[in-house]
A protein has these predicted regions:
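Chalcogenol-based redox active-site neighborhoods
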Residues: 1-159
Length: 159
């Protein structure tokens, strides 16, 4: 799949996810350096892939999903980036993020390749949204065409 990053076309690496398929389990790193597995989370999941929490669009995006998550029942919002866990923890504290789980894919890039969001030119994740039901069936996917743009919040939150 192709997206653009600051206007430059980039071919994403990894397996493109489609609605209806079962989402792959993946490994990541929690902010406390502990192991994270998608399979450890029960119920519905909204997975938010971002390039870096330290950018204005990613910052605004995670804040928006954090605010929305306050009203969710039975849905866990997971934000994943290549940021180091220490940076994620610092950013969450400074931004008051307390309803979203942030995890890092820096170590294995497991999520990057299993969900088809790896940007090889910069070593970051593309911006994407995945909504999974309680059985990990994919019910919504958005690979944002321009990585520096916002996702369609309304569609993602309605999914």
């Amino acid at each position: 799949m192709k997206v653009t990053f600051a206007g430059t076309p980039v071919e994403l690496q990894g397996n493109e996810i489609k609605v209806g398929q079962t989402a792959a389990d993946f490994n990541a790193v929690k902010n406390d350096l502990g192991a994270f597995k998608l399979s450890d989370i029960k119920g519905r999941k909204l997975i938010v892939a971002v390039p870096s929490l330290d950018t204005s669009v990613c910052d605004a995006e995670v804040r928006r999903f954090n605010a929305a998550a306050a009203g969710f029942k039975g849905t866990t919002v997971i934000t994943i980036s290549m940021d180091l866990p220490f940076a994620q923890s610092r950013w969450c504290g400074a931004a008051g993020i307390d309803k979203v789980i942030t995890v890092s894919d820096y170590k294995e890039r497991d999520f990057a390749f299993k969900y088809g969001v790896y940007l090889p030119n910069v070593g970051l994740l593309a911006r994407a949204i995945f909504v999974l039901d309680e059985h990990n069936k994919v019910t919504y996917v958005e690979y944002v065409p321009e990585v520096t743009a916002h996702p369609d919040y309304d569609k993602a939150l309605a999914a």
